[in-house]
């Protein structure tokens, strides 16, 4: 199958600096896939970018053994997330965050001329009646964007900075 370069089903990796996520992306969204990482929604563009593409990546919330997309609700508009694929890093800047019914798929469609990636998880936590959609628009991956993503990682999910865990000398 396409993009199965590592022969283990991994087609890419998704990185979300704000919430300290770095997860493998697998083909499909079966329970088996979602138990171990992020799934690429069949029928959407492969996560390789390009004009008039829209890849959709889905991950679980609240798994006891893995956080995956548990903290996705902490991502903010303007945040950067990255897709690492084929020795390339694709950067996306979050431009839309919304909660929809599971049957509402209009926001996952290709928009001619645009390169979008949407991260999807169930919400609210423990009820899972709706879907949280975090969409990013492709932006050039420059040193500035890399620095911006690193800054978001430092701020952490609540924007207050990561707690210092070093013990005093």
Per-range role (PLM):
Residues 1-169:
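Solvent-exposed, non-transmembrane regions of membrane-associated and secreted proteins
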């Amino acid at each position: 199958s396409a993009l199965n370069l590592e022969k283990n089903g991994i087609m890419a990796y998704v990185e979300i600096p704000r919430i300290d996520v770095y997860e493998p992306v697998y083909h499909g969204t079966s329970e088996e896939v979602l138990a171990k990482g992020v799934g690429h929604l069949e029928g959407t563009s492969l996560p390789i970018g390009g004009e008039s593409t829209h890849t959709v990546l889905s991950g679980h919330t609240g798994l006891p053994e893995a956080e995956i997309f548990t903290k996705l609700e902490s991502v903010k508009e303007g945040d950067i997330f990255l897709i690492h694929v084929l020795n390339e890093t694709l950067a996306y800047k979050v431009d839309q965050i919304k909660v929809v019914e599971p049957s509402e798929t209009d926001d996952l469609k290709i928009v001619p001329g645009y390169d979008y990636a949407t991260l999807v998880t169930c919400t609210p936590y423990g009820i899972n009646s709706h879907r949280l959609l975090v969409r990013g628009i492709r932006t050039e991956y420059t040193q500035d964007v890399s620095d911006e993503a690193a800054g978001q990682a430092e701020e952490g999910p609540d924007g207050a900075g990561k707690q210092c865990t070093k013990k005093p000398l």
